[in-house]
Amino acid sequence: MKYQTLSGLLALSLLFGCSSSPDVVPDVPPSQLYSEAQTALQSGTWLTAIEKLEALDSRYPFGAYSEQVQLDLIYAYYKNDDLALGLATIERFTRLNPTHEKMDWVLYMRGLTHMAQDRNFMHDLFNIDRRDRDPEPVKAAFADFKKLLQRYPNSPYAEDAQRRMFALKNRLAEYDLATADFYLRREAWIAAINRTQELQKTYPDTEAARKSLEIQLEAYQQLGLTDAIERTKQLMQLNPL
């Protein structure tokens, strides 16, 4: 909840305080401004597209292009890595248009945007392992894609959402594994066992669940729990890495 509150405040401050000013965009008819925004979107000049779309949104909030402008902003913000602005626009659109025909796409984009929050360019560039970083954006993305599948099972975005959920599940399982390993290294044996048990229950079909048996075994050995040791060894034989 703290994560959602802070991110929401940040998004609102960005949306109303830091977005590009419509004053820099010439005062032209909305049809011309919309056409220029579409040209910028098609050419991938995201910042230009955003400036023109924001100007349209500000000057003509109830105009003929208002809904499509918001949808285009959602996409442009995502492509430009303006993720907080993207999420704020998604929430606004969802609140104003809960039954819109493109709500499946909006849910899909919310999932993609939350996934993008989990990315870190420097970590990807230098291949730094950050399995222990905050998983809240991943949980949010998983929930978005799950909601998409539940509400719109025949959506053209459903298949890709399902594939992404599989990857997100592995990411969450790796986080729990890293947490269990942290407890093990701190000699917090019970905490390590509890975390591995939770991992195995929640994500039983992941590699992280199989790896967690090694942590569980060591913790049981440190506690001298003979029956639990034997049971874990049997599970390791049945679930080899």
Swiss-Prot record:
Keywords, comma-separated and alphabetical: Cell outer membrane, Lipoprotein, Membrane, Palmitate, Signal
Gene3D superfamilies in the cross-refs: Tetratricopeptide repeat domain (1.25.40.10)
Compartments where located: Cell outer membrane
Transmembrane stretches, start-end: none
Lipidation (N-palmitoyl cysteine): 18
InterPro entries assigned to the protein according to its UniProt record, in alphabetical order: BamD, BamD-like, TPR-like_helical_dom_sf
GO biological process per UniProt: Gram-negative-bacterium-type cell outer membrane assembly; protein insertion into membrane
Lipid-acceptor residues (S-diacylglycerol cysteine): 18
Major localization listed first in the record, in broad terms: membrane
Leader sequence residues: 1-17
Keyword Signal: yes
Gene Ontology cellular component annotations, sorted alphabetically: Bam protein complex
Membrane topology: Lipid-anchor
NCBIfam families, A to Z: OM_YfiO
Family from the record: Belongs to the BamD family.
Chain's role: Part of the outer membrane protein assembly complex, which is involved in assembly and insertion of beta-barrel proteins into the outer membrane.
Quaternary structure and interacting proteins, as annotated: Part of the Bam complex.
Official protein name in the record: Outer membrane protein assembly factor BamD
